[in-house]
Amino acid sequence: MKKWQFVGTTALGATLLLGACGGGNGGSGNSDLKGEAKGDGSSTVAPIVEKLNEKWAQDHSDAKISAGQAGTGAGFQKFIAGDIDFADASRPIKDEEKQKLQDKNIKYKEFKIAQDGVTVAVNKENDFVDELDKQQLKAIYSGKAKTWKDVNSKWPDKKINAVSPNSSHGTYDFFENEVMNKEDIKAEKNADTNAIVSSVTKNKEGIGYFGYNFYVQNKDKLKEVKIKDENCKATEPTKKTIQDNSYALSRPLFIYVNEKALKDNKVMSEFIKFVLEDKGKAAEEAGYVAAPEKTYKSQLDDLKAFIDKNQKSDDKKSDDKKSEDKK
């Protein structure tokens, strides 16, 4: 697992440098805010959090956001254990994860921070795979189609080299739900998305899937595949098709926050406000797609209402205590 201490450009060395230099414009804005909020989770969401922290650190040199990228599933495990304040996720929380949180009396808030399109790509030299439907993808990743000819009789009789994220990734869960229909993924699995990209670029018969941002970063070495299903015509992932959901493998990206952390940790609540007020700009900079503006506005309104409600509750408790002390 790669762990980043995000305060600016993410790596620990950069964190120390930013602290020594005052975090760029540190000292302005809400510079009296001090403390830390801890998170972990999706490697897909991680680049967005990185971009957000580059902006956050400019005005909050003493308010640190530390986040790992252990994968969505592993992030939720830590969230359930109470080890972190927030979990980054590239899929919605599962029912069994909700139940475990409920069993521990942990309440949470879900925030949609961006949109993504799981991109299917083949080797740049592949000159025959331009589009696939979900049934063909399922045949490839279930192992039933062993050669390209098994997928389409007009294609070469060459063995397919299919690569997938491993089960710790939300991208794996999303693909399993959207494409596999409960069948097991029988392909080479890797925890490192960059290794999946590398495998496809090095193997002429390679095929892999990953977040849109990983394709954007490597599009000179990969060939994207149009995807279709019964609801969507063959479409490639673009900012437009991902945002309007006309791309068949579009999905939202999330940050889940412990309600107690929102109430008690000013760094956590201010950071989430900052995320929503950014309105997806950091997501766009990281190669993903902003959600519709109304999504950020409605969530920000809900967050402010939640914070105000709890502040009033705290004030009332304080007043009640003072009254009790006077008796």
From Swiss-Prot:
Residues 307-327 are annotated as: Disordered. Residues 1-20 form the signal peptide. Gene3D superfamilies: Periplasmic binding protein-like II. PANTHER family: PERIPLASMIC PHOSPHATE BINDING COMPONENT OF PHOSPHATE ABC TRANSPORTER, PHOSPHATE-BINDING PROTEIN PSTS. It is a lipid-anchor. Belongs to the PstS family. SUPFAM superfamilies: Periplasmic binding protein-like II. GO terms for cellular component: plasma membrane. The complex is composed of two ATP-binding proteins (PstB), two transmembrane proteins (PstC and PstA) and a solute-binding protein (PstS). A lipid is attached at C21 (S-diacylglycerol cysteine). PROSITE patterns: PROKAR_LIPOPROTEIN (PS51257). Pfam families: PBP_like_2 (PF12849). GO terms for biological process: phosphate ion transport. Part of the ABC transporter complex PstSACB involved in phosphate import. A lipid is attached at C21 (N-palmitoyl cysteine). It comes from the Bacteria. This is Phosphate-binding protein PstS. It is found in: Cell membrane. GO terms for molecular function: phosphate ion binding. Keywords: Cell membrane, Lipoprotein, Membrane, Palmitate, Phosphate transport, Signal, Transport.
